């Protein structure tokens, strides 16, 4: 039974859990996200950014890929929401590279993976998670998961400024 959540941190016990039903490309990132909560990073967007930083600094290619994959998907989703034609152009056949094919394949597999679990239980789980986050101070609820794109942009700009 999948409730639409890839992980949960239980503050009372300090226990971080990652769902066995999460998509393979997201597993390492999800592990780092929940570990970030365990280390005291409560805000979802901050836990996402911390997970990205941990994954991207890892020598393990699975962790590094998972971090960059999730960062790409978050940025792509923000682009698609605000500039759909640019997002379409980014994925166009004219811009195909081996790396892009791998990422697109994983995006499609991840989408198929979660679509298989969609339904009443998943919707109820997302509603509960949204209420839970709002109760504990995340005003944007589940929308806060995507807000880490601002952190990624600021981090990348800081790297460029330092060069």
What are these regions (language model features)?
Residues 1-73:
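Acidic/His-rich structured neighborhood in mature extracellular/periplasmic domains
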Residues 20, 39, 43, 54-59, ...:
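Sec/Tat-exported extracytoplasmic proteins
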């Amino acid at each position: 039974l999948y409730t639409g959540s890839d992980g949960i941190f239980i503050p009372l016990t300090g226990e971080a859990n990652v769902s066995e039903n999460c998509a393979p490309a997201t597993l390492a990132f999800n592990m780092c996200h929940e570990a970030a909560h365990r280390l005291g990073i409560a805000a979802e967007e901050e836990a996402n950014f911390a997970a990205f930083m941990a994954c991207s600094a890892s020598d393990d290619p699975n962790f590094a890929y998972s971090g960059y994959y999730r960062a790409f998907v978050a940025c792509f989703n923000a682009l698609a929401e605000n500039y759909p034609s640019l997002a379409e152009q980014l994925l166009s056949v004219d811009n195909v590279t081996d790396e892009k094919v791998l990422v697109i394949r994983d995006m499609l597999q991840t989408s198929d993976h979660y679509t298989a679990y969609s339904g009443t239980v998943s919707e109820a789980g997302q509603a509960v998670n949204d209420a839970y986050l709002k109760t504990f101070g995340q005003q944007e609820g589940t929308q806060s998961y995507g807000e880490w794109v601002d952190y990624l942009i600021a981090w990348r700009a800081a790297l460029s400024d330092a060069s």
